[in-house]
Amino acid sequence: MKAADTVILWARSKNDQLRISFPPGLCWGDRMPDKDDIRLLPSALGVKKRKRGPKKQKENKPGKPRKRKKRDSEEEFGSERDEYREKSESGGSEYGTGPGRKRRRKHREKKEKKTKRRKKGEGDGGQKQVEQKSSATLLLTWGLEDVEHVFSEEDYHTLTNYKAFSQFMRPLIAKKNPKIPMSKMMTILGAKWREFSANNPFKGSAAAVAAAAAAAAAAVAEQVSAAVSSATPIAPSGPPALPPPPAADIQPPPIRRAKTKEGKGPGHKRRSKSPRVPDGRKKLRGKKMAPLKIKLGLLGGKRKKGGSYVFQSDEGPEPEAEESDLDSGSVHSASGRPDGPVRTKKLKRGRPGRKKKKVLGCPAVAGEEEVDGYETDHQDYCEVCQQGGEIILCDTCPRAYHLVCLDPELDRAPEGKWSCPHCEKEGVQWEAKEEEEEYEEEGEEEGEKEEEDDHMEYCRVCKDGGELLCCDACISSYHIHCLNPPLPDIPNGEWLCPRCTCPVLKGRVQKILHWRWGEPPVAVPAPQQADGNPDVPPPRPLQGRSEREFFVKWVGLSYWHCSWAKELQLEIFHLVMYRNYQRKNDMDEPPPLDYGSGEDDGKSDKRKVKDPHYAEMEEKYYRFGIKPEWMTVHRIINHSVDKKGNYHYLVKWRDLPYDQSTWEEDEMNIPEYEEHKQSYWRHRELIMGEDPAQPRKYKKKKKELQGDGPPSSPTNDPTVKYETQPRFITATGGTLHMYQLEGLNWLRFSWAQGTDTILADEMGLGKTIQTIVFLYSLYKEGHTKGPFLVSAPLSTIINWEREFQMWAPKFYVVTYTGDKDSRAIIRENEFSFEDNAIKGGKKAFKMKREAQVKFHVLLTSYELITIDQAALGSIRWACLVVDEAHRLKNNQSKFFRVLNGYKIDHKLLLTGTPLQNNLEELFHLLNFLTPERFNNLEGFLEEFADISKEDQIKKLHDLLGPHMLRRLKADVFKNMPAKTELIVRVELSPMQKKYYKYILTRNFEALNSRGGGNQVSLLNIMMDLKKCCNHPYLFPVAAMESPKLPSGAYEGGALIKSSGKLMLLQKMLRKLKEQGHRVLIFSQMTKMLDLLEDFLDYEGYKYERIDGGITGALRQEAIDRFNAPGAQQFCFLLSTRAGGLGINLATADTVIIFDSDWNPHNDIQAFSRAHRIGQANKVMIYRFVTRASVEERITQVAKRKMMLTHLVVRPGLGSKAGSMSKQELDDILKFGTEELFKDENEGENKEEDSSVIHYDNEAIARLLDRNQDATEDTDVQNMNEYLSSFKVAQYVVREEDKIEEIEREIIKQEENVDPDYWEKLLRHHYEQQQEDLARNLGKGKRVRKQVNYNDAAQEDQDNQSEYSVGSEEEDEDFDERPEGRRQSKRQLRNEKDKPLPPLLARVGGNIEVLGFNTRQRKAFLNAVMRWGMPPQDAFTTQWLVRDLRGKTEKEFKAYVSLFMRHLCEPGADGSETFADGVPREGLSRQQVLTRIGVMSLVKKKVQEFEHINGRWSMPELMPDPSADSKRSSRASSPTKTSPTTPEASATNSPCTSKPATPAPSEKGEGIRTPLEKEEAENQEEKPEKNSRIGEKMETEADAPSPAPSLGERLEPRKIPLEDEVPGVPGEMEPEPGYRGDREKSATESTPGERGEEKPLDGQEHRERPEGETGDLGKREDVKGDRELRPGPRDEPRSNGRREEKTEKPRFMFNIADGGFTELHTLWQNEERAAISSGKLNEIWHRRHDYWLLAGIVLHGYARWQDIQNDAQFAIINEPFKTEANKGNFLEMKNKFLARRFKLLEQALVIEEQLRRAAYLNLSQEPAHPAMALHARFAEAECLAESHQHLSKESLAGNKPANAVLHKVLNQLEELLSDMKADVTRLPATLSRIPPIAARLQMSERSILSRLASKGTEPHPTPAYPPGPYATPPGYGAAFSAAPVGALAAAGANYSQMPAGSFITAATNGPPVLVKKEKEMVGALVSDGLDRKEPRAGEVICIDD
């Protein structure tokens, strides 16, 4: 061991923790550990505080005081330093250096530690010594047996340390005393070891010394655990004394002032004060990594103070071992790597199965025998399996675990701090123990000039520097004025900060309920000046500040125990909870007090006056958000008795689930607590009989008990009717209606007869009450004691509970619902009084057979019947009640099957609609009731299918008679208010029509399948159409496009306009609100309810809502709020299914059924919520039905279904009648479609159409008039009442004539079914849509396109797109031209004789626009997507594809003009047509504009270099011009199969196209039309032919001058740039006046990242190396392509084909992308490779990129195959030649071209943006974050360059240089981390360049019209905006001047733009097509005019 090592002990007793450190050589013989050695901690959260004794002595030499290296400098404050070290060093060093490190649990008890120190004994040095008991005494005291063992000499040799001794002795002691507790075992072992060491004959040896030390350690631990609670001194006995330490160390310190320091303020980074701290350690501290702590049995290793090992080399001790641990340079690490940055969790290898403290011994130095032991505070066996082995240690408690014993088990030790599952559960946070130790080590360097100070450099409160007061127990520092209350002066003596003195919380906080400002603390008076004038009054004490206090609920305690906790306590003990609360709540203003009683203030004030207890509770609890119910006892569910005989009760609180039940003491002062205890014991006695444990005061006399319980034998005959209601009912205070009494009699009679029954009264007649009274009567009359099982929908369970309380007060009713935990508690405590009647735990187990059931009634939901069937199925039930029993209508449902397996004596089913759909369901109900009688479904159905109606009814009546009772409200309540149902027909809104048509078109195939569509798909279509009738926002697409508010809710206006129903609802609700009615709104779709919520919020109505997701308690609360007198809620939103069950909302008198259910019964269920007992007003029911839609048809079918199936007697109704036949579905779907598609044809005058329903105020008033009796639809009225007449008493069948009438009408409709209906209606829409889809598929996997509901289903809208734009804005530029004007259909018809075709015309069912039919419009769009905008002379060029050839120039130009105008029309893409009524045909502005823009950039780039690079990529392949002239001047491209379509045209433009190739798809990369495929095959078949045909140069007129002579070739023209600026990264690229020569082709022309070996795996995705960012900014001279000019070795490389062409053509090409893409990096590498290998053609580089772009200009976007087949671009094929024999060669090649083009496209877009930024003079404000980043980068660069030499010098061994290098590296690291932080913040601060329209302050349209006249040219406005991408005549010279005025805002300073900068560079993602904003046309179209000479040196601004 090194001299510096200390032995540290941990001892735990029950109440205290103690940590002792003392020099290893020193044993208790010398002296007692004084108060600084032993610190007592009250509480289990032990804070470890250590004090250093002197260093360990070498061998047996007497201990000297520590030797310091540099004494002189320290002498003056030596004593203070020692003192400080004693007091606070360990406390202060437990933290990381970082100021932010929070001190977790350590702070807590420092205060107590200090105050509880023991007072010094008599005198300074002499301490009272206490006898240590011998092992024999201890054993005697504890009554244990001693071990007889005589130690041999060998024992003394082998048992050299405590560990070995303990392993030897422990089993012996355990054998004698098998049940000995661990603590006693340890104490005895310690005593034994002490005696063993004392008797050791070999004492003098080194081994003995070490052994003695370990013994002392163990002894102290043991003595402490035994005796420390009494805190009496302990006397040592034992090994020989070592010399005591020098007196100086023991002297009491002089009084001193508390420690202060000068802080450096928040920004300052701390540096270690010690120059000798090795680098590795610094790194560790910087990262705040705790050291790796592995405990491995007996590995040789050296124990450092910090609790880690550093394994030591065998060479022997280091020379400086005594001086300092730190100097050895070893860092805490078990693995031996000094600088491992990340540590793994500490592991410990225990001895198998032994439980003991672990003392590790190890030889200190090779060759020496000395062994020292140390003890860790962790157990060395696994907590779970109690075995040893390799275990990991918890950082927050002494437990240890195997990795595999954890749950979930771990594969490897976790890194960093780790807390065990126990601590996690108890909420203990880790203690930074290792850091503490780590820093102690650092602090202990002997030669340090000044003490290591770990206190924070800034004040913990204000985060500022200055003179700070440092805590003696932790690293916190404070200004004295920041404390609360502020201190007037620095205090004397030791000072502890508020965190260290913060009291511990009384438990774990469950949640924070409220906060408030507390009282400010009392001020500290200023001390009197000693020399001051006594007359001068003392300064006024500084006032404290108020601090926040939090009202908290504790885990495991009830709300009665809630109390206030200080903010500091929460911050320390519950940091995460505190932070979350802070984040979610306003921490400046306390939350408003919530008068939890929920009543308005007036009522609660009155109540407070009357009830002082309530006032007190309000004051103390209720106003902080605690509901009174939560503090009200619901019932006591169990009791327990502690050792002292005190009773504790498990209390279930009202309105809280069972898992929040809490144990309360007997004496708790809770209202009604006594009564509940009384009833608990009384019920227990009833069930269990006499209980000896029962407290005497609760014991009842036998007689009293009998009154409570049921009679032991039946008191009357259940078959005898009650004429008046029985006494036990009257006692409850309730009165039954006569019909309910009849029901009760009938139920009792059936019970007596053993007949299971269905109670089928109509809704609202009180089936629940009749059932409860029936069960209660059975109990009270002694027929049965239960238990009864009631299964009901979750929503009605609360209602059942209430009714049971009311009508059956003596029943013990348990509600079995809730989560797993709640149900586990119910099973354990509520199923039986016997303790282990049922196994505990979350899984449900069977109940023991003989166990007595504790409850009378168990209420549960359907789901739990199936989920917990193990527990529930094991009980024998006297009666089962199923509420809403139509859940059993399907015998396949799990509920049916599970319930069938329960043991049940009697069954009662309740349902308001017994015969919902058909006989089959009725049969299943009967089958469930009496399976032995009803078990043949087929027989049953047949029997009732073929007899006449009368017989059927009679027979069914006889069959059902005994089992079913049904009464109607109409029969029972003659005076109940009437109800009127109206069907309200509503129009579809335009948006709904669009979606409706789309759905039909999209599903054309399903509708039209000859075998009749599959039923499921038809139902799906129907569902979609129903959604559409409700609201288009139910489709995700529409919802995405819809306008929203910042809160995420839909914007009200648009929401209402989009749906016909909402428009009507808006008007109705306003009127209803005025008239004071209240409304229930039912919808089947919960999403629709969401929309209705947004609608009601927008309209400002208060509402409640219930749907399937809102469960029992919340439901009932909502209902109660709505029904409360004077409630503000105006509407109640319900989902039809969830809201139809047992809910009473009789306070509302208007029901709106927003969408009808398929099943009319569900709707009846729904409106019966309002029309029920308790309703005082007439009920109006409005059923919204969309006119001419599936809804209207469904309503008709449903009416029929009501009539027929309600009778349960219609022939042929068998099983299938309930579900709709395909025929019916088809009929429903057809309904109204013809009219819908016809609608558009009438054009604009639809509003006047008489069939359109328009609701004005008058109509609404009529609709809401409650006096109308006649329903427009009398039959509906009658239907609904219809067999609400299945009375068992009398069957009445009314209105049979009407029934037949309706049937007939429908059957007639069914007869004349047109088999081709869908074919005629939808075929062409469908085909059109398929074309659209194919076009939009693009390449690769189709991105699911937004559902384009507007396209497809209209004849006149052949191919509309999901990206439609519609706008009412007039187009000012085109108004004067008739073809541009918006014209009515009539005008158009009259203009047919005019030369231009009309704007819109219908020809043979197809719409034509300006004479262009669908196919031609599609062809035109395809051409645009292929070549960009048509050039000026497009009509005379090959741009005009085959489909458009028939058009005159005028028509063509007019259409181009119209197309452009539509492109620029602002507005959402959602509308069906453009502003002028032209259908939007799949036109996505964004895509088209993007494509036009990209093609424009490509064309311009190619034109820029075309005159230098010529037209042929390999001029040697150029065909002989003489041969060429014989061919037609309009050569077809090689893709044409025959060369013979010579439609000559006078002038060819550079963007020639091949007329014969079909148009590509929009993103035509992947899909080719069949024609293309054919061509492609032909191309492969006939390569020779193609090469023969050759390819003529595009325009002979413009053919490049013959290749220059050799001399000329070597010197391409160099034209100087106007503004050459050396670019700083991030500065503006100068804009040359002449782009052709604008830059040298970046450094060199760049090489093939793919040689021939791999032409495909591009490096496009490499990130740009840092140094190269500037390489484009540094504008190199424009030298053409010098590096590319071949040396002599390349010269004759012309593939041997044309020897005569020896000179290389000139070549020049560049894209100035500012380094924002990786293009230039690629080019550099590729060119390097190409030049060095001489394979200029075979390695892809800059030259190939140019020709790729040229090919795209000629052949169109992504026509890779055409380009490869064109001889002009032969160079593109060169790099792939070596791959040609591979299987996937073509695909590989095309993929590479596509990827490469994406990169070029990206670079072009960025270049364009840079140009715009320059043009706009955009510059960045210096204060902007982007500039800070820029400055930091420059700083880093400068720093790096200026210190390059250091690394060489440092390596050469120059130590100062080494130190400086480290400093520089640290600075660099800081700079880089700052830059990293800046970069992460950047995106938020960046904004985009405003759209061009905003920058020019012009609308898109006016920009477009300006563009029509390019520059200053005088020619008149042409009939369409000229193709802005055609080259202006002067292109290539300086650009034409910008038109005056067009650029008004051009000079706008960047500072006027929206804040934020514009740098978003795609440097590391794959190249993506940079999406343009809507400005694309504007901005790119205006390229010609958007230019001017740039300013130099400005910041690059990019709009990505």
Swiss-Prot record:
Gene: CHD3
Disease with which this protein is associated in UniProt: Snijders Blok-Campeau syndrome: An autosomal dominant neurodevelopmental disorder characterized by intellectual disability with a wide range of severity, developmental delay, and impaired speech and language skills. Speech-related problems include dysarthria, speech apraxia, oromotor problems, and stuttering. Additional clinical features are macrocephaly, characteristic facial features such as prominent forehead and hypertelorism, hypotonia, and joint laxity.
PTM text: Sumoylation at Lys-1971 results in dissociation from chromatin and suppression of transcriptional repression.
Organism classification: Eukaryota, Metazoa, Chordata, Craniata, Vertebrata
Region span, Disordered: 23-133, 231-359, 431-452, 523-542, 587-611, 692-721, 1349-1399, 1513-1707
Protein name per Swiss-Prot or TrEMBL: Chromodomain-helicase-DNA-binding protein 3
Modified residues (Phosphothreonine): T376, T1646
Oligomer and partners: Component of the nucleosome remodeling and deacetylase (NuRD) repressor complex, composed of core proteins MTA1, MTA2, MTA3, RBBP4, RBBP7, HDAC1, HDAC2, MBD2, MBD3, and peripherally associated proteins CDK2AP1, CDK2AP2, GATAD2A, GATAD2B, CHD3, CHD4 and CHD5. The exact stoichiometry of the NuRD complex is unknown, and some subunits such as MBD2 and MBD3, GATAD2A and GATAD2B, and CHD3, CHD4 and CHD5 define mutually exclusive NuRD complexes. Interacts with CBX1. Interacts with CBX3. Interacts with CBX5. Interacts (via its C-terminal) with HABP4. Interacts with HDAC1. Interacts with MTA1.
Coarse class of the protein's main subcellular location: nucleus
Domain Helicase ATP-binding, chain residue ranges per copy: 748-932
Tissues where the protein occurs: Widely expressed.
Role, per record: ATP-dependent chromatin-remodeling factor that binds and distorts nucleosomal DNA. Acts as a component of the histone deacetylase NuRD complex which participates in the remodeling of chromatin. Involved in transcriptional repression as part of the NuRD complex. Required for anchoring centrosomal pericentrin in both interphase and mitosis, for spindle organization and centrosome integrity.
Pfam families the record matches: CHDCT2, CHDII_SANT-like, CHDNT, Chromo, DUF1087, Helicase_C, PHD, SNF2-rel_dom
